[in-house]
Amino acid sequence: SKVDMTARLLKLKRDIDNKMAWPKWSPTERWAAQQALNSALDILDEYHY
């Protein structure tokens, strides 16, 4: 569901921020991943079903 997908993306954002996911990434890589996830969340928010 949309709620489940949103929760999974938000968890991924937290894990990237806390270095739980991909701990060797540079700050620039983390920032880029966060921007991509923000875009994914925006698209998901616009999705109606």
Regions found by a protein language model. Name each.
Residues 7-49:
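Short, charge-rich amphipathic interface segments used for partner binding and complex assembly
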